[in-house]
Amino acid sequence: MLVLQFLLGMGVNLIGLPSENTGGAKVITGILLGLHILLSLGLLVGAALCLLRSGPLDDAMRNQVLLGGVLVVVSLVAGILDTSLGSSWWSFLMAVSFIGAFVVYGRIYVTTARA
């Protein structure tokens, strides 16, 4: 899901927001942005479910799950602020928190797959 989220976001970034386009490009970027938003809500729900299901894990792993959830929330908020305010700093924060979430959830996956 995180890789698809990244690709959708890059598609919107390359083409531009719907308000910046006309014709077919406006339709395409609107669809990409809509899918990007829906997937971000799915990531938020997934992070919440991971946190709820982390009860039987040890403290270190629960902290990793919490960190991943926080990074997803930060990325979501930064994305909203980037779209609303248009500042590249919010886009940078969104990218950094996305990369952090990708690394944290990757580490969680590898650790639990070995067990």
What label would you give each PLM region?
Residues M1-A115:
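Polytopic transmembrane helical bundles with strong interfacial aromatic enrichment
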